[in-house]
UniProtKB/Swiss-Prot annotation:
<dbReference type="InterPro" id="IPR004528">
    <property type="entry name" value="KdsB"/>
</dbReference>
<comment type="similarity">
    <text>Belongs to the KdsB family.</text>
</comment>
<keyword id="KW-0448">Lipopolysaccharide biosynthesis</keyword>
<dbReference type="GO" id="GO:0033468">
    <property type="term" value="P:CMP-keto-3-deoxy-D-manno-octulosonic acid biosynthetic process"/>
</dbReference>
<comment type="pathway">
    <text>Bacterial outer membrane biogenesis; lipopolysaccharide biosynthesis.</text>
</comment>
<protein>
    <recommendedName>
        <fullName>3-deoxy-manno-octulosonate cytidylyltransferase</fullName>
        <ecNumber>2.7.7.38</ecNumber>
    </recommendedName>
</protein>
<dbReference type="GO" id="GO:0005829">
    <property type="term" value="C:cytosol"/>
</dbReference>
<dbReference type="GO" id="GO:0008690">
    <property type="term" value="F:3-deoxy-manno-octulosonate cytidylyltransferase activity"/>
</dbReference>
<keyword id="KW-0548">Nucleotidyltransferase</keyword>
<dbReference type="InterPro" id="IPR029044">
    <property type="entry name" value="Nucleotide-diphossugar_trans"/>
</dbReference>
<dbReference type="GO" id="GO:0009103">
    <property type="term" value="P:lipopolysaccharide biosynthetic process"/>
</dbReference>
<keyword id="KW-0808">Transferase</keyword>
<dbReference type="InterPro" id="IPR003329">
    <property type="entry name" value="Cytidylyl_trans"/>
</dbReference>
<keyword id="KW-0963">Cytoplasm</keyword>
<comment type="function">
    <text>Activates KDO (a required 8-carbon sugar) for incorporation into bacterial lipopolysaccharide in Gram-negative bacteria.</text>
</comment>
<dbReference type="Pfam" id="PF02348">
    <property type="entry name" value="CTP_transf_3"/>
</dbReference>
<comment type="pathway">
    <text>Nucleotide-sugar biosynthesis; CMP-3-deoxy-D-manno-octulosonate biosynthesis; CMP-3-deoxy-D-manno-octulosonate from 3-deoxy-D-manno-octulosonate and CTP: step 1/1.</text>
</comment>
Length: 252
């Protein structure tokens, strides 16, 4: 299975400015993500950034980085520019690995790519993990997803879904039989669909939930959803997250 990885790495994070270059174990965070992508067996890995400092750090380590437009509203839009700049054929398999996931399991990256290979009628693939913790189920920063019988995503939300009308209240334990799923923010696409995505208008649902994958569902396309027993490792959104991940690296 051949696939490429693009790592969107935006410097100007509102909650943690300069996040891609945050030091973890003596190296910029983005290089740890890049290591994981290479361990997954990617044919190539490209860091797509909006800042020359990130580009310089990646290139100094001997890897490829592209300076992309600062006007992109999502990581997917940044991937579109990479696919166009590098002239990737339409059938090229591309996995979007978030630049703030220095502990991501390489096996998850491969699985996202495999999902798209297996489900040829999907334009996009992603992953999910069962939710067992009540706090995660009601946390808006933990994105939930529901799937149909065939394994395609029906909807993604920051709200608790599915909501069991008669068995759940916010102050009570979560019923385990509802099968709630936590979305793992990995996406696989074919380069041809990335070009199509660039022409799709953003949707009201996407803007409401602030979830870019809802644009794909809004326009009637299918997203394959692989459910994995592997729990996602903690990412880095805030200074507290960064301290937690640094501690995990120090403990290894």
């Amino acid at each position: 299975m051949h696939f490429r990885v693009v790592i969107p790495a935006r410097y100007g994070s509102s909650r943690l400015p300069g996040k891609p270059l945050a030091d973890i174990g003596g190296r910029p965070m983005v290089l740890h993500v890049l290591d994981r992508a290479l361990q997954a067996g990617a044919e190539s890995v490209v860091v797509a950034t909006d800042d020359a400092r990130v580009q310089a750090a990646v290139e100094a380590a001997g890897h490829q980085a592209l300076l992309t437009s600062p006007d992109h509203q999502s990581g997917t839009e940044r991937l579109v520019e990479v696919a166009e700049t590098l002239g990737w054929p339409d059938d090229t398999l591309v996995v979007n690995v978030q630049g703030d996931e220095p502990l991501i399991d390489p096996a998850l990256i491969r699985e996202a790519a495999r999902q798209l290979v297996v489900h040829t009628d999907a334009v996009m693939a992603t992953l999910a993990h069962p939710i067992h913790d009540h706090a995660d189920f009601v946390n808006p920063n933990v994105v939930k997803v529901v799937a149909d019988e065939a394994g395609y995503a029906v909807y993604f939300s920051r709200a608790p879904i599915p909501w069991p009308r008669d068995a759940f209240a916010a102050e009570q334990p979560m019923p385990h039989e509802i099968g709630a799923l936590r979305h793992i923010g990995l996406y696989a696409y074919r380069a041809g669909f990335l070009r199509t995505y660039a022409s799709l208008a953003s949707s009201p649902l996407e803007r409401c939930e602030m979830l870019e994958q809802l644009r794909v569902l809004w326009h009637g396309y299918r997203i394959s959803l692989g459910v994995t027993p592997t729990a996602p490792a903690p990412g880095v959104d805030t200074a507290d997250d960064l301290a937690r991940v640094r501690a995990l690296f120090a403990a290894v």
